[in-house]
């Protein structure tokens, strides 16, 4: 996969290479998916509505497929990338829209897996408030996202751990650097104050 100079999900190359790329860059991706799936099962009622916010190719939807089917629940995947829409492979429907401008129905479960870091920081608070307002009583919003690194030496250790994981997963050092540089101004990790 060619790394764009400025990261985007709007190229065919990124979309078609996404599932492999994300697992190379984030060696714990499948473990995190499994954890989210386990938690999510506890909040999907019979006939419920689930939003996969920032659904990409449908990873979360695929992992929840059996539960959704058994409980006759609806899944709506939301993602702004038309290229991701073209290759989406999960139950439910795909809506091509920025997550923060979509008109949500009241829902039982919202899942935001590695998505908030791509929402402008100035829009995050209102977006999260809106999601909370739309979440039905007894429902849940699962957020799994990148946080700003800690300051000081511990931050250095954690950054190195991330880089080592990518390298040990077989990602070329040049590609790791290209990807990090391409995220400038596009990916803004969540701060602890948010």
State each model region's role.
Residues 1-17:
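N-terminal, positively charged/glycine-rich alpha-helical extensions of SAM-dependent methyltransferases
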Residues 28-46:
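Conserved alpha-helix/loop element of class I SAM-dependent methyltransferases that forms part
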Residues 51-101:
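Class I SAM-dependent methyltransferase SAM/SAH-binding core
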Residues 111:
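A conserved beta-strand element that flanks and buttresses the S-adenosyl-L-methionine
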Residues 114-118:
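Short catalytic micro-motifs in class I SAM-dependent methyltransferases
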Residues 125-137:
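A short glycine-rich, Lys/Arg-flanked "PGG" loop and its adjoining helix->strand segment in the class I
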Residues 142-168:
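Conserved class I S-adenosyl-L-methionine
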Residues 185-194:
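Short alpha-helix
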């Amino acid at each position: 996969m060619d790394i764009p100079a400025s990261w985007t999900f709007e190229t065919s190359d990124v979309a078609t290479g996404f599932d492999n790329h994300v697992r190379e860059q984030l060696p714990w991706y499948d473990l995190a998916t499994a954890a989210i799936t386990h938690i999510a099962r506890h909040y999907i009622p019979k006939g419920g509505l689930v939003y996969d916010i920032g659904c990409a190719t449908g990873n979360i939807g695929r992992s929840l497929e059996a539960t959704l089917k058994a409980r006759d629940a609806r899944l709506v995947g939301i993602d702004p990338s038309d290229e991701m829409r073209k290759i989406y492979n999960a139950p439910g429907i795909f809506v091509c829209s920025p997550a923060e401008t979509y008109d949500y129905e009241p829902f039982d479960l919202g899942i935001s897996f590695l998505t908030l870091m791509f929402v402008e920081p100035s829009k995050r608070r209102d977006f999260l408030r809106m999601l909370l307002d739309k979440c039905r009583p007894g429902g849940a919003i699962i957020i799994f996202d990148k946080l700003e690194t800690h300051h000081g030496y511990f931050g250095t250790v954690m950054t190195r751990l991330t880089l080592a994981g990518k390298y040990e997963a077989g990602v070329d050092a040049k590609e790791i650097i290209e990807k990090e540089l391409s995220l400038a101004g596009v990916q803004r990790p969540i701060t602890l104050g948010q």
